[in-house]
Amino acid sequence: SVQDAIDTAVASAMVADSPVKASYGSKGFRLETRDGNWQTNLQWRAQFRYSNPYGSDPRQIANYEDASGSSFEQRRLRMKIGGHGFQPWIKYYFELDLQPARDVDADAVSSSARVIDWRVDLTKWDWASVRLGQWKVDLNRERGDSSGRQQFVERSIVNRIFTVDRQVGVQLRGRLFDGTLADMRYYAGVFNGEGRGTKNSSTDHLYMGRLQWNFLGRDLAWRQTDVEYTELPTGSLAVAGFTNTGPCTRWSSSGCGNLDGFAKPIVAEDDQFKIEQAVQEFAFKYRGLSIQQEWHRKFVSDRVAGTDSDLTGFYVQTGYFFHNLIEAFPAPLELAARYAYVSEPNKAMRSIYNEREEFSLGANWFFSGHSNKVTVDFSHLTLDDGLLETTHSENRFRVQWDVSF
């Protein structure tokens, strides 16, 4: 009708005259000024998981002897806010973890809301940009890949021991020789080394570096699986490392922590542990095929006990959308496999080493890419206790719905 046409024209004119436009995309709801200088994206995310028998990877004999757990878990209830201000190259991002899951005997504070990421990026030049704030240090892909962009329900057994996780600091980063066979990315940073939201307890800092070669001249995004169906073969080969002196022997989203058998940070001296760690990494994607691999070495010097320990970790995983070969195979379904290995000091006697292995098979059904998917995986987990000279094993089943709005 004439009235409807008038109403539509008036509404269109009002939208065109508005200084702010609204939309929805891969980063959630977006508000943006028409000059492009200001932008805010808001996204909500949640994971709902069922695990049997373990909620986390078993590491000690006692875990294998008590394999009776069966649990539903709300994971990573997150709010993400990011965008840019003043200029498109002045970017910001922060992320809130609204309700971390906790054990029944844990303090309620452990499940309270917390800011896990906050950072500002100055990206005027591709060859040199600066990031400052708190984020997951860009050391390796498995940890750097978002938990919402994983190929399995959770990261491998390697992650807990070798991640440097979130730190507070500053980093210089950039991309050189874009589009050539020498295409590469570099990262060099200085951090407190005490984990998330923590001041430095000494004059020492955590120093890290990463060099990534995009050997086919194309950059590979930090996300797992090839649900995007990469048309041209794309891969990267990287080496990275860090050194730190302080009370921490491991890190997580909760901050500074300790490896099994090592002093907890609350009782350790400020400069008790010197850590040197290196990683080699490979990643590749092509037409539904994805491959990712890492090899880690970690050296821990205990200045109080006068001991040196070294840890080794390795994993390789691959996935494929078989619809690309067999038309009758469902297009949204990806099948995946992973092997992981860890060698670490025995908790009771650090001069003797335990070995753990993970054999996992997984399947992903993508309703809307990584933004809405169901993941199922089955793992066979083993422990060779070097002190008692015994071998233990158990199977684990997990299923998870991961959704972002």
Language-model segments: what does each one mean?
Residues 1-47, 54-61, 179-183, 221-222, ...:
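N-terminal periplasmic/intermembrane-space "pro-region" immediately following the signal or transit peptide
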Residues 15, 20-21, 55, 65, ...:
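Outer-membrane beta-barrel pore domains
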Residues 25, 38, 68-77, 111-116, ...:
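Residues that define the transmembrane beta-barrel architecture of outer-membrane proteins
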Residues 29-33, 44-46, 74, 79-83, ...:
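Residues on the lipid-exposed face of transmembrane beta-strands in outer-membrane beta-barrel proteins
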Residues 31-40, 55, 86-90, 127, ...:
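Short loop/turn motifs that connect adjacent beta-strands in outer-membrane beta-barrel proteins
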Residues 43-49, 93-97, 133-135, 187-191, ...:
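Transmembrane beta-strands of outer-membrane beta-barrel proteins
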